[in-house]
Amino acid sequence: MDYQNEDDMRQGSRVVQTHTIPALGLIHKSNPLIIRSTLTTMDEKYVESIWALLKSAIQEIQKKNNSGLSFEELYRNAYTMVLHKYGERLYTGLKEVVTQHLENKVREDVLRSLHNNFLQTLNLAWNDHQTSMVMIRDILMYMDRVYVQQNDVDNVYNLGLIIFRDQVVRYGCVRDHLRETLLGMVARERRGEVVDRSAIKNACQMLMLLGINNRQVYEEDFERPFLQQSAEFYRMESQKFLAENSASVYIKKVEARICEESERAKHYLDESTESRIVEVVEEELIKIHMKTIVEMENSGVVHMLKNQKTEDLGCMYKLFSRVSDGLRTVCDCVSQFLREQGRALVQEEHESTTNAVLYVQNLLDLKDRFDHFLHYSFNNDKNYKQMIASDFEYFLNLNPKSPEYLSLFIDDKLKKGVKGMTEQEIEGILDKTMVLFRFLQEKDVFERYYKQHLAKRLLLNKSVSDDSEKNMISKLKTECGCQFTSKLEGMFKDITVSNTIMDEFKDHVLTSGANLHGVDISVRVLTTGFWPTQSATPKCSMPTAPRDAFDAFRRFYLAKHSGRQLTLQPQLGSADLNAVFYGPRREESNCGGLDTPSSSSSIGNGSSTSGSQVSQRSSQCNTPRKHIIQVSTYQMCVLMLFNKRERLTYEEIQGETDIPERDLVRALQSLAMGKATQRILLKHPRTKEIESTNCFCVNDSFTSKLHRVKIQTVAAKGESEPERRETRNKVDEDRKHEIEAAIVRIMKARKRMPHNILVTEVTEQLRGRFLPSPVIIKKRIEGLIEREYLARTPEDRKVYTYVA
């Protein structure tokens, strides 16, 4: 075709050199052609002849006999019809020819193949139809560009698709058979049979293309019934799986099914179906049965947790993360189990609740277990992490002894003599302990106990190292702030200052020639308020020599610091006694004596402890055995009595020493009922408890391979109930002041506040130390109103104002 462009034919009367368009498509030699400005109407017969030519060509294309056709001529003829306003005739004719071919030939072939190579026949017909429509579209390209656009109808190719869809694919039994065939093949493959995947893929692609610009045909004719059938299939399979398998096996089978369906969709279904079919599998195999799966007896979440099934838990977490509320369901089950385990550990009847170290170690082991699950099974999920923290906070605070026991555990780790542990290992344990500390709601109670235990470590020189102690205080400071640790840091300062004072005192003794009666005294001067000293002066009748040595120090100290007061605190001191044992006791002899010792004392700002020694020897004894006995100040006071008396009853000892009953019982238990290598005294009768009628004497048969023998004080595994009540009363008293201080701080800043908001802010301010109850806060508010720090507003009694 030699026109420069189609518009050249509309440029008026102009002579152009070209080929003429023959009426019946025959090619003639070149002749001049005159095109006039007004096109004449074509003769009807001429139009019919052109259409007959085009119709014949279309039919030949459909029969695959297109090799002898001149597509250039056919294009010109179609162009001529459209140009002369016969586009509708051409469009309608095309529709009729294509419809007739599909109805009479293609559909009949497909119907005959319903039970024999159906998909192959349909696919062949579909491919042939697509090929023919591409050729027809090329011939009728001008009609697509002009008539189709002007009249807003389907283009040639899409028209062919629509006719194929309606006359073949969606024709009655063909549509049903296609659906059932595809669904049947998928079902067979699910059962493990081998099917022609390419045939299914071709059919699905055909349905997608027949939707033209949407997926409606594919969705209605295949996907929707496919998803419905799949839901029914997996609904039945889930029941079978649950009945026959454990939770872990069930999870693995579900994972396999999801992978199968995903792979199936990628290989021969439309890619958009993948997410939909996977969602169906997740719904039927997971979501509907979530609770059943996690609660499976002997295989569910609890079983996995009990038996460290880390990998199985990870599989369950991964699987349940696919469905809404899946992770919450697993999390709730884990939480319930964790709370049960925690409650069992902290309840009074559990054996560990009488042993602080075992109590805390069990909690740390439980935390380690669930941290392991968190990392390796639950992908460090922040919700699971928060759940574990919340659960630990819940059951740790069920037991009011937790603050005390946590402090005792730290005390155990920071004492000298921890076997088989490096400083790095101790550091790791203390870091874990700090995690438990964060869960404590009564941190002020912990502070009180920690102060007591730290005092004993410092005063008795039991700390594994100053660095470890200061490192622990640094951890507490980071967690709670400097106010929490200021007193603890003050205790360390006192020890440093005391060392300097003792150096000065020793120089004073040398220069003044003071007589300390052989007592090598060491005093710790403690600042009231920093140390857990008793408010009332403890009762204890000190032996003469230690008392005289202490009095010498008192005079020296008060001469340098006039206006201060020193009070002995014997419960915090210790002593080294030089002891001599003269052999096994004879009926007629009184053997055994305690020779002059060195002693150490601890003095507080109003408190001090000291030990002293007196020498005396008995006769009629065997070869003497000398030992240095390391004891507490109370134990020293008891032992020194036996330098003057062979036998003493409990009541006599109490009368002579004036030691508080509770402390005296512990001292005697350590001396007479400890390990065989530490029994300095003998008790009669040999009962399990110290009683007022018991009689005591020196164990002349005492022997030890060690020259220096340390008498282990019967350490309280925790406070006794009376002690605990006393501590609780002190804590409650301190809390009153802290609550009132918080109320005043808030009201001073805000001037006016409603009751509920004030309670909330006070609770939030004090949360780092303890959780005050609204009732207690209300009482403290009323107390401040009585003392005229606050006032109620006249218009609303639930609103308070600050009184400057």
What are these regions (language model features)?
Residues 2-804:
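Eukaryotic scaffold/interaction segments
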